[in-house]
Amino acid sequence: MDLKSKIRQIEGFPKEGISFKDITTVLKEGEALQYVTDQLTEQLKDLNIDIIVGPEARGFLVGTPVAYKLGVGFVPVRKPGKLPAETLTYEYELEYGTDSLQIHKDSIRPGQRVAIVDDLLATGGTVLATAKMVEALGGQVVSMNFLIELTGLKGRDILKGYEIKSLVEYEF
């Protein structure tokens, strides 16, 4: 399948100079959604994954069906104040300021083999924060898998040491 033909690009969204990669066009088409799920599952099937972790919000949409196909659970990583039980918070740097993410403290058991699945790898900040929380809880991040990678933003550079795979690459 020509997956790039299924991803809508919107120029100037959310601001001028950005070419937004809209995956709702993939999600609404059953064949494309199955293809993405099958391809991500194929990347992970031999890694003995115990659990999938997905960052808010599109990581939920991509990661949950992969977890289902692998027969493992799914753990959401959310913005602060969105998870009801005791959480671990990780604050990370943005170009101008900081942001933070949270995960339930009881969501990862020590020694669990974790795959982080998300829709997009850009600068790598969100997925690195996610990995740091998983590791703080004792999990082992064995793979990071993405539908889209924006290679020009060099997210891989801050993720050295992690296994990274993506289905589609764009420069920006």
UniProtKB/Swiss-Prot annotation:
Record-listed E.C. numbers: 2.4.2.7
CDD domains listed in its UniProt record: PRTases_typeI
Example GO biological process: adenine salvage
Organism annotation: Alkaliphilus oremlandii (strain OhILAs) (Clostridium oremlandii (strain OhILAs))
Function summary: Catalyzes a salvage reaction resulting in the formation of AMP, that is energically less costly than de novo synthesis.
Pathway: Purine metabolism; AMP biosynthesis via salvage pathway; AMP from adenine: step 1/1
A single MF term (Gene Ontology): adenine binding
InterPro entries, sorted: Ade_phspho_trans (IPR005764), PRibTrfase_dom (IPR000836), PRTase-like (IPR029057), UPRTase/APRTase (IPR050054)
Chemical reaction(s) catalysed: AMP + diphosphate = 5-phospho-alpha-D-ribose 1-diphosphate + adenine
Classification via NCBIfam families: apt (TIGR01090), PRK02304.1-2 (NF002633), PRK02304.1-3 (NF002634), PRK02304.1-5 (NF002636)
Keyword annotations: Cytoplasm, Glycosyltransferase, Purine salvage, Transferase
Family statement: Belongs to the purine/pyrimidine phosphoribosyltransferase family.
Record bears the keyword Disulfide bond: no
Annotated GO CC locations: cytoplasm
Primary enzyme class: transferase
Protein name: Adenine phosphoribosyltransferase
Localization of this protein: Cytoplasm
